[in-house]
């Protein structure tokens, strides 16, 4: 029983409550990947239909509607995306980009990139 109680704070951090909206306040660094055409038309966690050609992304915790600048740390290329989907916390990715955003970053071939996320101006 005690072990279960000790695990609860960890679960609260791993899975933000509905209504809890952690914002991008500072720089975040991690791995970006992208999800492609097979998801076209499927509903995202925000309820919108996935459009591979829109500049959108999935995040484990950022609020829907957040605008973030994603910059490839190797090349310096960047793109601004809107968060409209969720990534499971066990996914070990910082962000999952649409095809259009991945193309703009130049990561379609390798599929992943080491990136920095910062709030986009006007976000």
Region roles according to the model:
Residues 2-123:
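Secreted/periplasmic proteins
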């Amino acid at each position: 029983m005690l072990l279960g109680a000790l695990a609860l704070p960890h679960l609260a951090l791993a899975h933000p409550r509905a209504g809890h909206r952690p914002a991008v306040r500072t720089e975040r660094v991690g791995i970006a990947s992208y999800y492609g055409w097979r998801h076209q038309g499927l509903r995202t966690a925000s309820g919108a239909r996935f459009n591979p050609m829109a500049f959108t992304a999935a995040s484990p915790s950022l609020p829907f509607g957040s605008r973030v600048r994603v910059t490839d740390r190797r090349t310096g290329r960047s793109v601004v995306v809107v968060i409209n989907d969720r990534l499971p916390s066990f996914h070990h990715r910082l962000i999952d980009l649409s095809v259009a955003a991945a193309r703009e970053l130049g990561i379609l071939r390798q599929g992943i990139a080491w990136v920095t996320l910062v709030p986009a101006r006007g976000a």
